[in-house]
Amino acid sequence: MTSTPIERAVYIVSDSTGITAETFSHSVLSQFDEVNFKPVRLPFIDTLDKAREVVARINRNALEAGVPPIVFSTLVNPEILALVRQSNGVFLDLFGTFVSHIEQALGLKSSHSIGRSHMAANSEKYRNRIDAINFSLAHDDGQFVNQLDQADVILVGVSRCGKTPTSLYLAMQYAVKAANFPLTPDDFERGALPKTIAPYRGKLFGLSIQPERLAEVRNERRPNSHYARLEQCRYEVAEAERMMRREGISWLSTTTKSIEEIATTVLQEVGLERV
């Protein structure tokens, strides 16, 4: 008999987008498998009236659940921060925890600027990300090949092994121009890389996946098809890995890895800088 997972509400409160708090909370809470966390995202809490509504919501949850919810905060405004801190939650001030120590180390006061880490609308970094996203979308699944020389990395692997989400994550998070190209049964029969990507061997990085997991994913897309049969998946995965080993292409299995882990490994293996 399996025990019922513990449930706990998690409030992610920010006076900007909340992306920083959400990313941090996800990394921390993923360490507790036995708890079913229920995230509630509350971005743009930038007035005292909004803060009072947040406090009421947190207090109501604490009363109904019988346990205090966890509150991750990247609030910068001192008044709003002080108000939300008084709620009946386990309050975690992410900026305050680190900023005060850095202020002491530098002998300086921080600017307390809301959303400073995301104010990039007109910056070169923002434009680079947009360019990378457009590139990755245009070069998804081998559909456009005329500018592969401009790619920072070309992900290769069998269909549905995770190439597209990894390409887009690299583009959105790190401004990496990531193309992706499928390895197909036709390539395995020829025993060679597709001619289109062969000249860019130095840019190639492979993704693989366990056949059983691949069959599950493919069955969601094309149920009961030859494409989704376990035998076909085993054949394609084995042939793709054999080809990557023969061609000297670094690769990893995506089966048990998060998109963040996959992307970080690609960056390290290919030698790309994080932007």
From Swiss-Prot:
From the UniProt record, list the reaction(s) this protein catalyses: [pyruvate, water dikinase] + ADP = [pyruvate, water dikinase]-phosphate + AMP + H(+); [pyruvate, water dikinase]-phosphate + phosphate + H(+) = [pyruvate, water dikinase] + diphosphate
Entry EC no(s): 2.7.11.33, 2.7.4.28
Q: Where is the signal peptide?
A: none
Which EC class, in a word?
A: transferase
What InterPro entries would the database entry show? Kinase-pyrophosphorylase, PSRP
Q: Keywords assigned by UniProt? A: Kinase, Nucleotide-binding, Serine/threonine-protein kinase, Transferase
Q: Where does ADP bind?
A: 157-164
GO function terms (MF aspect): ADP binding; ATP binding; phosphotransferase activity, phosphate group as acceptor; protein serine/threonine kinase activity
Q: Which Pfam families match?
A: Kinase-PPPase (PF03618)
Domain of life where this protein originates: Bacteria
Q: Could you tell me which HAMAP family the record lists for this protein?
A: PSRP (MF_01062)
Q: Please report which protein family the annotation says this sequence is part of.
A: Belongs to the pyruvate, phosphate/water dikinase regulatory protein family. PSRP subfamily.
Tell me the function of this protein: Bifunctional serine/threonine kinase and phosphorylase involved in the regulation of the phosphoenolpyruvate synthase (PEPS) by catalyzing its phosphorylation/dephosphorylation.
Protein known as: Putative phosphoenolpyruvate synthase regulatory protein
Instruction: Please name the source species.
Output: Bordetella parapertussis (strain 12822 / ATCC BAA-587 / NCTC 13253)
